[in-house]
Design a protein with these regions (language model features):
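Flexible, low-complexity linker/hinge segments
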Residues: 1-5, 118-139
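Conserved AMP-binding/adenylate-forming core of the ANL superfamily
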Residues: 2, 21-50, 58, 64, ...
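Conserved AMP-binding A3 loop
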Residues: 31-33, 140-167
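AMP-binding/adenylate-forming catalytic core of the ANL superfamily
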Residues: 104, 337, 342-343, 365-452, ...
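Gly/Ser/Thr-rich phosphate-binding loop
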Residues: 207, 230-233, 245-303, 314
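Conserved ATP/PPi-binding loop(s) of AMP-dependent carboxylate-activating enzymes
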Residues: 308-312, 323-354, 389-391
Length: 483
């Protein structure tokens, strides 16, 4: 464990980079020394604003060198850094910003009372050693879940956990990460640095000696070609679309060496097809916001395995009674990682459900083979993964049932070429009422956001029942939309 707290390892990477380019943004190139300078000035600005250990700072930022530096500066002053994803529905954004937030930092038009990056950068750097104020047991960052339960849950990771992560420490990289790091010469960054995946691969790129390349328009394959990217994160739907585009009109992807598939499982045959069309570049990671990376399959691994968990990560497969099961037997995955969250911020009930005895209950189902490879086979949760975001069926059902036209609502998921999975709803009308599908979709969108809006809404007389007489959603078949 380093003598100085996080982000000492990241600052050391920037200092070692010196005049080497570490971020490209349009025509602008930022070196390690320049980015370190931005961190120092932004940390000074935050301290001048009275912010320090234990303070919550909401980062409402784009993807720029200053945004990356602001996140690191927040850690330098020992704050609780809260990345706010763009596009959050109003109610969810208000929920995040009311969770013990002392200040908002933005690079856009500031709301009343918000601090701007430009204002913070006006604070001069005193030239002395950059003081790091993080305390081991303080929460260093909150990474919010998708909000599919109605309000996003903030996974709380301490400074001690950030220090324990391997990302910025090459000597601690497991074999799959070493192989991936060797391909990160030009890592394409887009979307939001509030994304745990996007930010962590950015730090890994620094440690690997590569350059983060910002794509303001992340359409694939165009962005890969334009920026000569060697690596990028990709969701399952985007992977499928890229494979289809390459079959129809191949683009020059000769620079590409790694695509890190994130967010949801890839069907084995589709993964083989992707590797046939794109070459040996597809890495399939498995992890959760609560745990970080659990395992990663490299291009040489055989689908549908998600690879070997590193030695520093404990994975147990347990039966419904919590008893570990032997290799080859399916069960629920319980995971323990050095950098895992300690719980959900201000949510003791959900924390007790998921975090128990030092383990994280993933609520994913899988098994090991005799050689120790990990396989995923399903979920214990009633969730649908749309565009790599988990959306719980329950809140969608409750939103639909809030309509006076609806007596009962049931939601299921089904594979979808465009979004990985899609939400499909079945509704029983209230007596004498005729549901309006457009109004129901608007109701869900306003309450839970676009990702929860059903792709189809089917009116039924009653829900099918299982042998027990209870409603059985497994008997509901979504409409075939392949035609």
């Amino acid at each position: 464990m380093p003598a100085d707290p996080y982000p000492r390892a990241v600052l050391d990477l920037l200092a070692a980079a010196g005049d080497r380019p570490v971020i490209e943004h349009g025509t602008r190139t930022v070196t390690g020394a320049q980015l370190l300078g931005l961190v120092r000035r932004l940390a000074a600005g935050l301290r001048a604003a009275g912010l320090g250990p234990g303070d919550g700072i909401a980062m409402m930022l784009g993807v720029t060198p200053e945004a990356f530096a602001a996140m690191i500066a927040g850690y330098a002053v020992g704050a609780r850094v809260v990345g706010v994803r763009p596009g959050l529905p109003g109610a969810q954004a208000r929920h995040v910003l009311r969770q013990d937030i002392a200040a908002i930092v933005t690079d856009a038009d500031p709301a009343q009372g918000a601090l701007t990056v430009a204002e913070l950068l006006e604070t001069p750097d005193d030239g002395g050693p950059l003081r790091l104020s993080g305390r081991p047991h303080d929460v260093a960052r909150l990474v919010h879940t998708s909000g599919s339960t109605g309000t996003p849950k903030g996974c709380a990771q301490t400074y001690a956990a950030m220090d324990a992560a391997w990302t910025a420490r090459p000597a601690a990289w497991p074999p799959a990460i070493k192989e991936l790091a060797s391909r990160l010469q030009r890592y394409l960054v887009f979307g939001s640095l509030a994304s745990q995946v996007m930010m962590e691969y950015g730090v890994l790129t620094l440690a690997a000696g590569g350059t983060m390349v910002v794509a303001d328009k992340p359409a694939f394959p165009d962005a890969i070609v334009e920026h000569r990217a060697s690596a990028s994160v990709i969701t399952v739907p985007r992977l499928y679309r890229l494979v289809a585009a390459q079959r129809a009109a191949p683009a020059d992807l000769s620079s590409l060496r790694a695509l890190m598939v994130s967010g949801s499982p890839v069907e084995a045959s589709r993964l083989r097809e992707a590797r046939d069309v794109l070459g040996p570049v597809v890495f399939h990671g498995y992890g959760q916001t609560e745990t970080g990376t659990i395992s990663m399959a490299t291009p040489s691994d055989v689908p549908p395995s998600v690879g070997f968990p590193p030695d520093v990560i404990d994975v147990e497969i347990r039966d419904p009674d919590g008893v570990p099961v032997p290799a080859g037997t399916d069960g629920e995955l319980y995971v323990r990682t050095p950098a895992q969250a300690i719980g959900y911020w201000a949510d003791p009930g959900e924390t007790a459900e998921v975090f128990a005895g030092g383990w994280v209950r993933t609520r994913d189902l899988g098994h090991f083979d005799d050689d120790g490879r990990l396989y995923l086979v399903g979920r214990t949760r009633d969730v649908i993964i749309v565009n790599a975001n988990l959306h719980y069926a329950g809140p969608i059902e409750r939103a639909l049932a809030a309509s006076p036209d609806i007596a009962e609502a049931y939601v299921v998921g089904a594979p979808d070429e465009d979004t990985g999975e899609a939400v499909h709803a079945f509704v029983v009308p209230a007596a004498g009422r005729t549901p309006d599908v457009g109004s129901l979709r608007t109701l869900v969108r306003d309450r839970l956001g676009d990702g929860c809006v059903p792709a189809t809404i089917t009116v039924i007389d009653e829900v099918p029942s299982g042998p027990s007489g209870k409603p059985d959603k497994r008997l509901l078949e979504p409409p075939d939309r392949t035609g």
